[in-house]
Structure formats: C-alpha cells, structure tokens
Amino acid sequence: MKLVIVESPAKAKTINKYLGDEFKVIASFGHIRDLPSKKGSVLPDKNFAMEYDISDKASKYVDAIVKYARKAEAVYLATDPDREGESISWHVAEVIKEKNKVESDDFFKRVAFNEITKKAIIHAVENPRKLDTNLVNAQQARRALDYLVGFTLSPLLWRKLPGCKSAGRVQSVALRLICDREDEIERFKAEEYWDISLKMQNSNNELFTAKLTHVNDQKLKKFSIINEKEAKDLTRKLKLQKFYVEKIEKKQQKRQPQPPFITSSLQQEAARKLGFSAKKTMQIAQKLYEGVDIGKETIGLITYMRTDGVTLSNDAIADIRKLIDKNYGNKYLPINPRIYQSKVKNAQEAHEAIRPTNITYTPDNLKQKLEKDYYKLYELIWQRTIACQMENVIMDLVIANLASENKEYLAKANGSIIAFDGFYKVYRESLDDEDEEDNKMLPPLKAQEHIKTKEVIPNKHFTEPPPRYSEASLVKKLEELGIGRPSTYASILSVLQDRKYVTLEKKRFIPEELGRLVTVFLVGFFKKYVEYDFTAGLENELDEIAAGKLEWKTSLNNFWSGFNNNIESVNEQKITEIINYLQKALDYHLFGENKESKVCPSCKTGQLSLKLGKFGAFLACSNYPECTFKKSIVSGNDNNEDEGNLSTILNDNKILGTDKDGVEIYLKTGPYGPYIQLGEQCGKVKPKRTPVPTNLKQSEITLEVALKLLSLPLKIGIHKDSGEEIIIGYSKFGPYIKYMCKFISVPKKYDFLNLNLDDAIKLIENNKAKLEKKHRSMV
C-alpha cells in the first residue's frame, strides 16, 4: 500500500478517485504540529531551537497517519504547493520518522500539483521530488518571527497599555496604515474651488456640455477660481461671449485586458463586484480548488488559489484561445497569445495564476450545480481568465476645442464611444474608488461652426480627504508595499477586526481607540518595527531563505538582537512616561486645535487627560479625586455604563499576562472586591476565579502572584509523621491549611502563597496543641 497524505478530507476525496487501489489517501486536517502558545517555544539562546507540540485536536489524526504509515511501502506527501504546504509535509515526515523509527528519507515522496485534475495528480505521483528544506526553513523563520514578536511584545503591551490584546509583526503594520489614513482624514482641511461648465447647442439644435479651460491664454488649474465672487464674475463675462468650434480632434484609444487573477487581485475584485470579504473569498476559493460536487462527480474547478504569479500554462492558453474562437469568433482572438509579467513587489511566479482547471466548464454549465456564492466566484474567475486572452477594446474619442470669438476664452468638450467591445464582451474590471463619468457621445460638430451658449454654470467644489481603506484597497496597498504574502492577507484583516482594533463600516476600515493607542505606542517606542520598508525587507529575507540564498537562523539572529534590546529598553520606561507620550501623540485626535476643549467642563479648572480603563480609553479630570468628571472616547460608551468610582475603572479588567497554555489572566473588580479570572466566559461555562487576599494591594498583584492564587488549593507536601497530604488554600475566611479533613487558619504574619512545608507542619502542631489545651481546660 502507498500512503498519500493531504490537508483536508475534501481534497482527499477528490484525489482518491484518480488513484488506483494501491493508494490510500488520508487527511492531516491542516498542521499536525505547531509552536505551543507559551513561553519557551522558540529559544534564541539555543540557536533558535523550536519546541513543537502535537495539539490535542491533531493527536487522533496523527495516530491514524502513523498507523497507516507503518503498513505503507512509501508515503506520498501531497500538501499544497507553497511554503505552508511544504511545512505541513515536513512536520508529517518528522512525526512518522520519530514514531515509526524511520531512518531513510527515501521513504517519503513529495508530490506537488497546481490543480486537482486526474492528469495533474498522475503526473505528480509519477514524478515525485524530495522535500524542499529551503521552503521549510522559510516557513519556520516566519513562524519564529511571528512568535518572538507576539510573545515578547504582547505581554509588554498588557503591562504598559491595559486592555490592549496583542501586537503582531505584520498585523501591526497593517493597523498603522489604517490609523495613518485616519490621521490624514482628521487633519484634512477642505479647500474651496470652482469650475465653469457651458451648456452649448450646435447648428442642429443638439445640446452638449463643455468645460472652461483657458482665460486670456492662461490654463485654468484646480485653484484658479477660488471663491464665488470670482466664479460669478467669469460667468457674467462668458454669457456675453459667442463661441465657435476651433478644432476637432479624433483618435482611437485601446484598452488592454487585465492579467488573470492572483490572490490579491481576486480578493480585491470579489470585494468590489461581489461584496465578499477577503476571508470569505479565500474560503470559497479553497473549496473550488479542493473539489466540489457537480452532480456526476467531485472535481477541483480552479487552480491553486494562493499565488502571486500571472502566468498561464501553454495548454491552458491553447484551450482558452480555442474557446474564444468557437464562442465569440475570430475577431475577438489576438494573433498571438498574451503573456503577462507580474507587477507585484517580490512576486515569486512559482505558480500559475488562478484559472479554471477546465475552461469548457462555463458558468452557464455549472449554474444549477453550484451553491450561489460558489457560482459567483467561479464565474468571476472564468470571465477574467477568458478576457485576459481576448482582443483589446477600441474606443473612438472626439475632442472639440471651442473658442470665444475674441479668443479670450477656451473650452473643451469630450465624447467617446466603444468602436469594438473586445474583452468587454466577457468582462469589465471594477475600480475601488470609481470616479469616471459615463462615456457620452458628442453630437456632430464641424470646425469653424458657430455654437450657441445656452447656459453658463458655475460649479462649487471642495477638496476631499483621502478615502478610508476598503478591504480591496488595503490589500492592494499591502501588496504594493511588499508587506505580507498571498496566504496572509485574509488573516491579517480578520485578526484586526477580531482584536477590536478596527471596525468595518460601510465596507471601510475605521480604527477603534484601542487600535490607535496600540499604533501610537508602537510608532513611539518600536518605530523601526512598524516601518513599511522594514517589514517589506523581512519579507525579502524570507524569500531569500526560500530560494536558498540566506541562512534562516542568521536572519532570525539579525532581527532578534535589535528587537530584544528594544523590548528591554521599553520595559524600563515608567508607565507615566508612556502615558505622557500617548497624550501628546493623540492630542490633536482628542482635542483638535481648540485649547479650550482640554478644560474640564465640570470643575472648569482642571485639564482633561487620557486614561485607560474598563470600557477602553476615556478622558478624566486632572483634579481627581476632588473632581470625578470622566468622558468615554470609545464609540457607544457615552452612557451610564462607565459611571462609578474612577480609581476602580482605572484598574478594572487589567490583563496580567497568560498561563502556560496562552490563556489570558485578568485582574477584575466585582461587587465583593477584586478577583483573579482565568480566560473569558464561553457559553455557560464560567472561567475559574479566585478572590484577591485582603492583605494584598491591587498594585501588588503580578502575573506570578495571580498564577499562584489560581493554583489554589495546592498540595505543598506530606506530613513527615502521619504521611497525610498538607494542602494550602484560600476562602472567603482567608488563607487556610487543610490537613486530615481539618481546616487551620494561616495567621497574617505568614506569606501564605510562599508557605513552606516546615512552617505548615509547625502551624498544624501549634493548632493541635491549642485544641488539646482547650480540651483539658474543659475537663
């Protein structure tokens, strides 16, 4: 038996039917090993050793893989053809080697394919290769970088900015883009400007519109007419003028089709045309790639969907051209096939573009066989693929230059018409911020023809701020900057929303206050690591590792030495210094240009300043506790929700850190006082909670103290005489020792969290002596 291992059951089902009975196809269900979410999973001091664990979820799949591998004559690793897929295959091979004592690498065959079709699968199985260690190392380097940033920067954030959940190597840079754009919008000052339109009529009484372009031989610029008075003066003068056609220009314009889809362009176009999120687009594309049921069979309908290559195979181009000729006619078919070059920064071109695996499966053929959203995305991919090999669109353009009889004023009218629809026959690309007017034809005009001016219209405009990022435009910007890779865009956008750092309103990203705080903090104290060029440079290094041009641990060492020094430096910063910096950096956002807006509206003498608390960021008066005014700056929290004791709000819901499993530990305040909580409530399952001892101040509750409290009740040893367990615990009556079903109070003079066995036995014996003395006195 030959064992074939893929990532998903759907992919396994599709591949299984193409291979004979000698093959057994099973799924790993994604990654079987990963770095556990705890300290020490990557060890810089040990040459970046990485401690991988098999998750509880993956263990049953690993058992099946190991069992079948014992019976197999060879293992075919058929995971996705990218770094992530190579990494999954490597982990599978490593686990099989360890569990089954396999020593030879020849036992493993790496098979890679760009599409799940019978031809591609058979060819891959017949032509296996060895695992590409360069690709594996590139993925390990990326994972290590993300871990080192997350598990050193996030805890620092929890200490310095209570309420902030995490920071990531790439997500923080994407967040900065969104926040920087919001800063531009807030600081933007609209400027007034005017232009003049003229409604004209030709000799056949046909109307058209022209725009004033020159006055006294001076070309009008955007701000040539800056107020209503100037516009009205010009309007009055133009009404007295007679115009004629000075010159007619005619020319043709050709529009070329866009390249076939890559990951980013598919996400952008699906967002514009279909309203799909990047996450939804990738989920559907994954299913279309792995295989869907179309009635008589399950087939993979598209090629691999994580790619930055725009090339198409020669066979695919031949099939596309054949279909164009058959369905649309020879005039829509260029003489030569179109060959595209990627414009993506650092594109790898390792895979084909995203295309249908069989171009003869037209959308019409599949409309009744696919789910609605699956059909929409497949149709988009099919149309773009066909269009990319079709003829140009040809536009006939007409430009009429008009002049006043005294030559003092010039105007221009434009018109266009589609002379040949070319690839428009199948597909038209959308624009993210479309501002093009509909194409209009001009009526017939002749040179020297006199034109009547029917109306002169002054048009008032204001400059507009840059638009907020949509999913499509943010992905495009990340791609232009060389930040992230095709496989990461969707997850970056999802994480920012899941962390409540940004919201998506009317399909545009708006940063939340927490998101802005994190960004300002990182720009202030970790500026290098959220610079666009630096992050893109790391992506370049990962590409060099994948190409075998750079040793991966050298790259990690170069990054870590500087980053760790930065962490240690910021750790020494006082929280007051950080708050002061945040206050200064966010001053314009919070108060604008009006200094009076900083004055406390309650006491009239204090100054408002930034604070962080239970409900996010808010403003509080500097005269606290004499003045308890506060105002939430988080959307939706200007209500009684944040009323209460200000000192409580400042310390409530503080994240202390995480336990060994990566679960967050909170310091909270309830109706009965402060308490420690492990994790969030999940449905009806309440998280573990323990009260804070009354002799401890909230400022004394560190992560170490919280972990000790959560570990209670805890066995601290065995009594040397009786052999019975001694347990330390804490209840509403205070700390206690439990011994032989008896509860013994721990006096305040003892640090009960660090109580040793000898002291515990001493307390037990003292309690025993007291009881015996009491008993004798009663007798």
Swiss-Prot record:
Catalytic residues, chain numbering: 304 (o-(5'-phospho-dna)-tyrosine intermediate)
Domain spans labelled Toprim: 1-111
Enzyme class label: isomerase
EC number(s) recorded for this UniProt protein: 5.6.2.1
Subunit structure: Monomer.
Protein name per its UniProtKB record: DNA topoisomerase 1
Keyword Cell membrane applies: no
GO biological process: DNA topological change
Zn finger region (C4-type): 600-627
Sequence segments annotated as region (Interaction with DNA): 166-171
The species this protein was found in: Rickettsia typhi (strain ATCC VR-144 / Wilmington)
NCBIfam families (UniProt xref): topA_bact (TIGR01051)
Keyword Membrane: no
Record's catalysed reaction(s): ATP-independent breakage of single-stranded DNA, followed by passage and rejoining
HAMAP family according to UniProt: Topoisom_1_prok
Required co-factors: Mg(2+)
Listed GO CC annotations: chromosome
InterPro entries assigned: Topo_IA, Topo_IA_2, Topo_IA_AS, Topo_IA_cen, Topo_IA_cen_sub1, Topo_IA_cen_sub2, Topo_IA_cen_sub3, Topo_IA_core_domain
MF terms (GO), sorted A to Z: DNA binding; DNA topoisomerase type I (single strand cut, ATP-independent) activity; zinc ion binding
Keywords: DNA-binding, Isomerase, Magnesium, Metal-binding, Topoisomerase, Zinc, Zinc-finger
Binding site for Mg(2+): 7, 80
